[in-house]
């Protein structure tokens, strides 16, 4: 077994990429086309939920135009991901051939960053999803890679994680309610009432205690609080239970002695645990119940402040799952929500129709930069580099993502390094001639 960092030291670092590690026995260009084919086929499978999920959820409203749009989105994601991944590995060959050896940052990090530039052609929706997922993985990886007092607290203190998740929950739900942030989050906020609704609430507040109580409105309108709460619980169970069932079916291996598909599925279902269902249910229950109670007992507070407190309290549902990845994901999404608010403020302050101040060109330029694509490229460079060099800092979900978008190529490279001794790698290199083309 060879420590991955030994790749950058003699004698391995001076071997040609067609001799060992990368693509022994075949040329660089052939390696690129092989990767492009394998990544395209693997991507059709890995990204199939992008096609199947809309067809299932929108089966009643699906028409020809919607289907073609969904299919186009799916195929574009598969193609550009395959191109980016294949080009990244081909850039490893280019850097090796130009520099004459494998170097630390020109072997994995820089080739990946360059190859990921094909993601500029990816649909914005998919790009934002990839940027969020990889940013969460990088944040968690950095916490594991650089252990100190602060990172240990963030990784191992449940109370700290819960408090920060609650803060992030309040920020995200607040900006989703204002329609500033429109992407994924675990909970949908109740809608913000119109000015006419607030006027009605103010008038109702002056009604005497013996008046008809049905006239009073809560944050959710005219429906009863019990129905508002029950609807949230139903949505939580509808979202969480399928995820837990899928997790039970996909996680782990089939127990030994299971004969037949039905027996294997039943054995898998026995491992069912309501992890996500419990999280969604508790999140919805705490968030919606606290919203009603705050409106009832602290109605003198502003509606936005009430909602911020309800969103904060709802985040305490983190205690049910207690996973670092949930905390890191919430931090990334909260930053995205704050950034979206910043962009809106910049647009409003520089609008010549509503503002008398001169436009701030620096802020306008900063707002228009596609940071999601830039950050994603850097994220992928970090993740691929550490997949080979510091495998333990990446979580299982990240490893699966990298295997999926590279058709297991990153895993093959790592296994070829770690599962062979130094002598075996040298012997493999000597047994293969240098092939620079095909």
Locate the predicted segments by residue.
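A cross-kingdom feature marking solvent-exposed beta-strand/loop segments within repeated
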Residues: 97-106, 150-155, 299-304
